Regions:
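Serine-esterase "nucleophile elbow" of acetyl-processing enzymes
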Residues: 1-41, 47-48, 160
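Alpha-helical cap/lid subdomain in secreted, periplasmic
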Residues: 44-176
């Protein structure tokens, strides 16, 4: 069994999605997930993961931060994004006034990058796991697939069929 935790780059279960191509999966990725939400989803499922199971983490952007589930956000109005967390750029583009002022007051790149790194460090310790990202990242322990996304943008996990197939091939290489 392959367990998947991550953001929208892993959330689709369509036939052409890399998450379907790679085999028998339990997919707990969700659109707009912060790294904290990815950690929490993993911790909830950890008791169900068997010793020989594979765990895939699709790490998100350092600038996506957790938002409690009972808070309103325009992105959460979409049925596909009910647990969407805040990403700095979206808040400003969508004019989320209730968050703009707070973020302008508290935002500190160093702090949010440090918290992100602490969570990633914890997840890197998960046995039998592989780590991917589609965002630019200085982390060398994480397989960076940003170039695949940029060259193959589309509707399934933000990629076209070719992009999803390429990601599946890379994951299959990691597993063997």
């Amino acid at each position: 069994m392959i367990w998947i935790f991550g953001d929208s780059f892993a959330s689709s279960g369509q036939d052409l999605s890399w998450t379907s191509i790679i085999g028998d999966t339990q997919n707990f990725a969700s659109n707009g997930s912060s790294e904290y939400r990815i950690l929490k989803n993993y911790l909830l499922q950890r008791p169900n993961i068997k010793e020989n199971d594979l765990v895939l983490f699709v790490h998100t952007s350092q600038s996506r931060i957790f938002l409690k589930d009972d808070r309103e956000l325009s992105s959460r109005m979409l049925s596909s994004h009910t647990n969407c967390d805040i990403i700095f750029n979206d808040v400003f583009e969508k004019k989320e006034k209730q968050y703009i002022e707070i973020l302008e007051l508290i935002w500190d790149d160093e702090f949010f990058n440090d918290i992100f790194d602490l969570i990633v460090d914890k997840l890197l310790g998960v046995p039998n796991s592989h780590h991917l990202t589609f965002f630019e990242s200085p982390r060398t322990e994480i397989v960076n697939l940003n170039h695949i996304w940029l060259a193959n943008q589309g509707e399934i996990n933000h990629m076209n069929e070719t992009g999803n197939r390429l990601v599946a091939e890379i994951i299959n290489q990691l597993m063997h």
